[in-house]
């Protein structure tokens, strides 16, 4: 079991099941861990991506069929797609400050579903983003994957 985390979000596995990703939201960090697919045991973790403070914090996430990790950036007004090397390769701007989770679904797994939050927004911020708390969709070029069930 992982310890020393403040708030863990965005849990997802790579398409081959050999890498586990998660976000430690308060520290602006995405981490990756090698996984033994036979036992499910996690190896040592490594920094996957460090977001700059003030540019959004990684919250919910998912992985697509190319092994890229998608992250919703709380207080960041966007979702990003990161390569397996941890580099941002795509940014999708959102009309809300707090995207909270992204999932890839639909019949072809090419529809992105992004939830958002309106929590603790000032009256002015709420007026500027009346759809905060809503669900948004957009199409992606690379389909998602069905995440494996957790056996532990």
Which role fits each region the language model picked out?
Residues 1-3, 44-51, 87-92:
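A short beta-strand motif characteristic of beta-propeller blades
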Residues 103-152:
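Blade-level signature of beta-propeller repeat domains, shared across WD40, Kelch, NHL, RCC1
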Residues 80-91, 97, 106, 112, ...:
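Flexible "stalk/tail and boundary" regions
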Residues 28-30, 77-79, 120-121, 135:
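Structural signal for beta-propeller blades
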